[in-house]
Amino acid sequence: MIGPISQINISGGLSEKETSSLISNEELKNIITQLETDISDGSWFHKNYSRMDVEVMPALVIQANNKYPEMNLNLVTSPLDLSIEIKNVIENGVRSSRFIINMGEGGIHFSVIDYKHINGKTSLILFEPANFNSMGPAMLAIRTKTAIERYQLPDCHFSMVEMDIQRSSSECGIFSFALAKKLYIERDSLLKIHEDNIKGILSDGENPLPHDKLDPYLPVTFYKHTQGKKRLNEYLNTNPQGVGTVVNKKNETIVNRFDNNKSIVDGKELSVSVHKKRIAEYKTLLKV
């Protein structure tokens, strides 16, 4: 069995042997087989994988930190713990870090926070893969904002932005994990959004930045797993240079990639890409 999330050391730095102890190979193989079956028979959109992602997330975070030590990825199981985690990275002189944050109190929603320390100032940007019209994202955002304000971190600038790329009900965890990795890989492209956050240009600090205002800040690679074609087209209308940009090792453009992962669900074109991403990430945890 996978250990309860609250009992796992999630700050990173565990060895491969310790990582493997979080989940048995046999259990993981069974999970992966079922995930692949769900994609094959088309039931993936109507399945709920939230609890599974909550349980596997600690192992994924440890694996990511072992592969990318400078990623500084942290898993925070409740917004109540976020401020002390941020304080720790500041005091340790960390200039850049990411926090995958869970709702806590038995909740299942995830978002991801990108942290940068620039000229003595702290910039925190919460990236919501869905939108803030839903209860889960709204509650997590409120709890996170309240926790940061309560701790009164010095010279700290916090904004919330919505990506609105998630359409299925239970993929916030794997979206947040994929975004965390992208925030690290594309870190040099994110300087402007953090500078604008510190200047107060990005948002007023009270209201989230809507997706159409966020789109100009982000490279097309952030939208690889966008589930809806309409949403992808909105991004490309704002960023036409992204249409011809190759986004992966298969030499696919973002539109090629969507078409190659397209599935018709309830009469709508939806991408199964993020579900395949979950399988790929779970497979990295398998031990020979």
Curated annotation (Swiss-Prot):
Keywords: Acyltransferase, Allosteric enzyme, Plasmid, Secreted, Transferase, Virulence. One of its GO terms (biological process) is negative regulation of MAPK cascade. It is found in: Secreted. It catalyses: L-threonyl-[protein] + acetyl-CoA = O-acetyl-L-threonyl-[protein] + CoA; L-seryl-[protein] + acetyl-CoA = O-acetyl-L-seryl-[protein] + CoA. One of its GO terms (molecular function) is O-acetyltransferase activity. GO terms for cellular component: extracellular region. Coiled coil: none annotated. Its cofactor is 1D-myo-inositol hexakisphosphate. 1D-myo-inositol hexakisphosphate binds at K182, L183, Y184, I185, K224, H225, R257. Its main location: secreted. The active site is at H109, E128, C172. Changing C172A: Abolished ability to inhibit the MAP kinase kinase (MAPKK) pathway and promote virulence. CoA binds at H109, R167, S168, Q227, G228, K229, K230, D266, G267, K268, E269, L270. It comes from the Bacteria. Its EC number is 2.3.1.-. It is an enzyme of class 2 (transferase). 1D-myo-inositol hexakisphosphate activates protein-acetyltransferase activity via an allosteric mechanism: 1D-myo-inositol hexakisphosphate-binding induces a conformational rearrangement that stimulates the interaction with acetyl-CoA. It holds the Pfam family Acetyltransf_14. NCBIfam families: PRK15371.1, YopJ_YopP_only. Belongs to the acetyltransferase YopJ family. Serine/threonine-protein acetyltransferase translocated into infected cells, which inhibits the host immune response and induces cell death by mediating acetylation of target proteins. Inhibits the MAPK and NF-kappa-B signaling pathways by acetylating protein-kinases such as MAP2K1, MAP2K6, MAP3K7/TAK1 and I-kappa-B kinase (CHUK/IKKA and IKBKB) on serine and threonine residues critical for their activation by phosphorylation, thereby preventing protein-kinase activation. This is Serine/threonine-protein acetyltransferase YopJ.
